[in-house]
Amino acid sequence: MDFTQPKPATALCGVVSADGKIAYPPGVKEITDKITTDEMIKRLKMVVKTFMDMDQDSEDEKQQYLPLALHLASEFFLRNPNKDVRLLVACCLADIFRIYAPEAPYTSHDKLKDIFLFITRQLKGLEDTKSPQFNRYFYLLENLAWVKSYNICFELEDCNEIFIQLFRTLFSVINNSHNKKVQMHMLDLMSSIIMEGDGVTQELLDSILINLIPAHKNLNKQSFDLAKVLLKRTVQTIEACIANFFNQVLVLGRSSVSDLSEHVFDLIQELFAIDPHLLLSVMPQLEFKLKSNDGEERLAVVRLLAKLFGSKDSDLATQNRPLWQCFLGRFNDIHVPVRLESVKFASHCLMNHPDLAKDLTEYLKVRSHDPEEAIRHDVIVTIITAAKRDLALVNDQLLGFVRERTLDKRWRVRKEAMMGLAQLYKKYCLHGEAGKEAAEKVSWIKDKLLHIYYQNSIDDKLLVEKIFAQYLVPHNLETEERMKCLYYLYASLDPNAVKALNEMWKCQNMLRSHVRELLDLHKQPTSEANCSAMFGKLMTIAKNLPDPGKAQDFVKKFNQVLGDDEKLRSQLELLISPTCSCKQADICVREIARKLANPKQPTNPFLEMVKFLLERIAPVHIDSEAISALVKLMNKSIEGTADDEEEGVSPDSAIRSGLELLKVLSFTHPTSFHSAETYESLLQCLRMEDDKVAEAAIQIFRNTGHKIETDLPQIRSTLIPILHQKAKRGTPHQAKQAVHCIHAIFSNKEVQLAQIFEPLSRSLNADVPEQLITPLVSLGHISMLAPDQFASPMKSVVANFIVKDLLMNDRSTGEKNGKLWSPDEEVSPEVLAKVQAIKLLVRWLLGMKNNQSKSANSTLRLLSAMLVSEGDLTEQKRISKSDMSRLRLAAGSAIMKLAQEPCYHEIITPEQFQLCALVINDECYQVRQIFAQKLHKALVKLLLPLEYMAIFALCAKDPVKERRAHARQCLLKNISIRREYIKQNPMATEKLLSLLPEYVVPYMIHLLAHDPDFTRSQDVDQLRDIKECLWFMLEVLMTKNENNSHAFMKKMAENIKLTRDAQSPDEAKTNEKLYTVCDVALCVINSKSALCNADSPKDPVLPMKFFTQPEKDFSNDKSYISEETRVLLLTGKPKPTGVLGTVNKPLSATGRKPYVRSAGTETGSNINASSELSPSAGNRSREQSSEASETGVSENEENPVRIISVTPVKSIDTVKNKEINSDQSTQGNISSDRGKKRIVTAAGAENIQQKPDEKADESGPPAPSKPRRGRRPKSESQGNATKNDDLSKPVSKGRKRAAGSQESLEAGNAKAPKLQDGAKKAVPAERQIDLQR
């Protein structure tokens, strides 16, 4: 730096001594520009020492050295190029300010400004603590701070420039090598300026705040700490300045006031962390910003407040409730990123402020249903993260939100929810990290996770399997620990979870068998048939992997590798071998994965897919050692030495569930059971009093004991007498399993079964029915398993005892308690024996598999008579209503069982099929429920002919929502299975008539044409009932127009009109009813589909059993329903009576007064008009109803006997032109719900028989009593199966509709399907998102 040549010293200072000389301290020579720098430094040091030793009281010295003081402030010194000179001069000047305080010796404002700027520049020397001059710099700082020298600058007009320079200098030099004294003096210096001045300018405030910005904070943490302490110290003074700054930027939008305007939110966060009082006036401004119209601005404020509210020591939420409530409102913001940020904040808030969980719960609930997948996902992450930190942080409601999301429509959300719950279960239940109370809180997780196995998605199933192997029962545990974990898990699962787990093992075992069959195909010579079989097997395997489309390619590639690599094949064979241990399986999986890995390809989707396959088929849990450990655990439970109570399971429950577990594993891992020790333990179980335990033990022997006879003769000799005893005197279930066990594991089965058959068949005594049940079960199963040996002897038993003695006689009188159903334990032994007798007849026939002796015809006539007589075969009116329900169910189920055998299906007449079908409309809820479940079970396994699927159309008449919902689920499942089967099996095209779901239409039309409630083909009310039943089926079939199926179904209905009813081809009325149903079907199809008018791809084939061949030159263009009727059917004009008139069929059942119809409507009521409305049956959640359809869980419990009466309901207004909402059916509002607004009695209420002396409905005059309808002539229906029938006696037909008391409930509550053309727009759902204004 260039300096001007200094003038003589006298001129430099302006004030000299009396003789014109500057007075220097003793020993100090004159300091001028003539001397060398070193000499100058030497002399200045002596001056510094002199001023350092002076104090304010030395008036003479002060006066003496005043010229020197002025001299040191000359330009020569202030601009000296030598830093040591400048430092010494600065020290002198600082002491001069101290000595002469409070008045400075310098009067010129410009000079003062130059001096303080000079001193400030020298303070930069504080930066280097290792400098030899550091102590002198420190002395300078200390002196300035102690004297508060800079306060002199307040008198200067532009003092702000000095202060800004000072603050910037101090913040820039502070570093981690400085001790606390340096920082303290800096703080003293700066705080005195802030607190004693008139205010802090924006530029000065910026010099402080800039150190809080993250970028600066990261560069120099010491400057951040200095600023932080400074702000804390001066909070009272500086708060107003800070408020003004934020007010300018946030409210007035004047970002130009400061270069820090763009960092306002960062500054607010830091200032809040330093001291919330700094922002007392700023927080209301943030509330204003939260309501900004700019989404990005709201997002920035939400991010800021999330940090402020969520920080650990923050009490902002309690101190500023309005701001907190305003912030919570952003959870419902219209801007997706704002909602997302709000949800992310919740995790920190839950962890740091558990007391705010209650406020957050409701908002998280809404966001857990957010339309944005990412937000739903983050809700789960938020809750799970907090729960993993401490389970006490989340309440049951929050965990419930995660539970709900396991059924989310998006895979990513479902996966996060499932994995999160699995981690919580492992942490708190398996490891018990927070004690028993926490474990109890999340004990439901295991059941919920396994329930997800019921979902259709293969991804869900695979994830459940992974969770089971890693979290519920970790496969990497030692065998004993792993089996203990499984043993007590199985004992504590709910029934649905147990079924899911069993299904999981079954699916894995099935996949193992597919892979085994694939490897067997590799061993065979190459041929076209072999290649075709291999391709089919590969497609089956691919269906069991994620993304089946891609999986097909990968499985084909894997198959090629298997074909080329024999060693890989041997590894895979070992993996699926029944003798493979868990440790071997782990080695095999790793070895196969290593061989297929490609080091050059870090992400290998092919390898990932193969790993999925290997994980599913590898026996990672169960081997011989594991079974042995399970058996030992069960033995400990039997001996009472196990930890059952500690694990929260009673010993009896542990034994029973342990044996059930072993029973399930005996299906999937039979080889692992083959040891004397295991079988000895099972023999011990056989001797236990618990019937369920013994039954399970027998079944395990049946599944696993194939080598007992040859390898373990001692076990064999002990087992045989026990099996004989169980077959003769055990429970019915034990008897069945014992017979099957003997048949499965012994070579001399004929001798063994004969030793059971002969004494049992001789000792049958109908007078002691309680001793009949087990013998009947055993005899039935023996005749089914060994028909060649026992079919003939059984014929005489059937003719002389079963039919003549047991079924055709009523020895006891049933209770007349009015109940239509009783629990199993209350059913009379005689009825139980009759039910088993019916089952025996079926098993006997199923064993023979032929009708050479015409026994099947006789049996079918007997079963038909049972249905026609409503279960009271003898018609002596001695049997109770609940017992009649049991026998109707048994008869209907028996016909359905026989229909599964082709030779018997052929001889079942249409009349008998119709009688069987009507059981699904029985008046007893449980009969309808159980029959529907049996029907579904057989159809879904493709065991029953397609015509039986038509029976589900009658479910439209069921008064209970649950039953209709179940029926619809069954239809969906059956139709999807049949379509999938046709796709997967090319050969199935030859059997399209029996497989294609659309072919159910002609069977349905024929069945409805013969509905006993369809008596008048032009009755609009009856036609509406028919339409409801048709649409119940057609709606499911018409969901998709696959292969132009709509036109195909229309063509079938049109073709039926060209035939005659094969059941009564010459009866004009019968044919007219058939053609009328066809026209109703055509009307429905035309109104629901615009695609049905296209040409059908093929001409449908009609079943010969139900329709005659079309006659030549026969045309039938006649419309059997008028245009007015057509409009009524489609527009849904309410009718005076409900669809349920069909369910509550007016039968004059035995033991009850004949049902009377009113003259005007033909749907009378026997319910008092002044009575109250009964509660409707509750509708289940989607999850429950879907599970019910899969698992057959009971949908109705027993109800106390009570008479429920209702008030007839007036017709509602016509509901027209609304769009049909297909989702209604999923919720249970199907078919007749779509057509009628139903008022349904509870399931128990409908099973209460009205007393005979109840008054008829007073709404209309009673019509004359009608005879019972529907029994066919004796020559057709009875034959030799009944004895002494009086044909003239009035009898009722086989269907008993749901109790007559419900008929008036439904009257007039119709809401028919709506026309699509004039569809009324649905009211949009209320929006959960807060539209920001």
Swiss-Prot record:
InterPro entries from the UniProt entry: ARM-like, ARM-type_fold, Pds5
Protein's cellular compartments: Nucleus
Extent of Polar residues compositional bias: 1160-1179, 1222-1232
Residue(s) carrying Phosphoserine: S1096, S1174, S1194, S1304
Positions of modified residues (N6-acetyllysine): K1145, K1210, K1289
GO biological process: anterior/posterior pattern specification; cell division; DNA repair; heart morphogenesis; lens development in camera-type eye; metanephros development; mitotic sister chromatid cohesion; negative regulation of DNA replication
Region: Disordered, residue numbers: 1133-1333
Intrachain disulfide bonds: none
HEAT repeat copies, ranges: 392-428
Keyword Cell division attributed: yes
One Pfam family matching this protein: PDS5
CDD domains, sorted: PDS5
Record field: compositional bias (Basic and acidic residues): 1317-1333
Keyword Repressor recorded: no
Modified residues (Phosphothreonine): T1207
Binding partners and assembly: Interacts with the cohesin complex. Interacts with WAPL (via FGF motifs) or CDCA5 (via the FGF motif); the interaction is direct, cohesin-dependent and competitive. Interacts with SMC3. Interacts with TP63.
Role played: Probable regulator of sister chromatid cohesion in mitosis which may stabilize cohesin complex association with chromatin. May couple sister chromatid cohesion during mitosis to DNA replication. Cohesion ensures that chromosome partitioning is accurate in both meiotic and mitotic cells and plays an important role in DNA repair.
Family: Belongs to the PDS5 family.
UniProt protein name: Sister chromatid cohesion protein PDS5 homolog A
Originating organism: Rattus norvegicus
